[in-house]
Each structure stands twice: as structure tokens, then as C-alpha cells.
Amino acid sequence: MSKLVISKERMYDVVRAPVITEKATMGSEFRQVTFKVPLDATKSEIKAAVEGIFGVKVTAVNTLIAKGKVKRFRGRPGVRSDVKKAVVTLAEGHSIDVTTGV
């Protein structure tokens, strides 16, 4: 499989923010880091972006879409936006410190 080439601008569009939750930080024991990504991002784009921005080797990318909840605002129902997350597994010996700025 050929390596996907994307622009620097698209890399920073794909990796929006790290997810800092108890469940996401438990994945660090298994060399996993979780990021928020756009709904149209593909696994190969996510892999290329993480490798390009952080300079690490990615072995796997798993994605999930969390559906937006129905909430009420001023008595009227509304829907929160859907959120796509990517769980990125890094190669042996590689790590990303998400607590520091990029």
C-alpha cells in the first residue's frame, strides 16, 4: 500500500484535539492515544496526519462516531453535533505526550 501524502494544513485539520478522559488515558498503557477528528476524515488520513505532526510510527487506527444527544434549550428540543474520535495505536517505543502543546 502506498503512503498517503496530505498537506500540512490538512494534517492540522484532521487532528483537532486530544481526548482527555479517564477511558482515553487508560489506553496509554497500550500505546494508544485518542483524538477528535472531522466526520469526513479517513483512517489513512488520520494515520498520515499523526505520523506527520508528531513524528511517530502508527500501527493501527480505530474510529468511532458518537451520535449527538437530544437536549433542550429554552424549552425547545435541539440536537448536539455528532463527534468522530480516532484511537491511534503507536508502534513499540513511540509515544505522544498530549498534555503539552503542539
Curated annotation (Swiss-Prot):
Keywords: Ribonucleoprotein, Ribosomal protein, RNA-binding, rRNA-binding. This is Large ribosomal subunit protein uL23. GO terms for cellular component: ribonucleoprotein complex; ribosome. One of its GO terms (biological process) is translation. One of the early assembly proteins it binds 23S rRNA. One of the proteins that surrounds the polypeptide exit tunnel on the outside of the ribosome. Forms the main docking site for trigger factor binding to the ribosome. It comes from the Bacteria. Part of the 50S ribosomal subunit. Contacts protein L29, and trigger factor when it is bound to the ribosome.
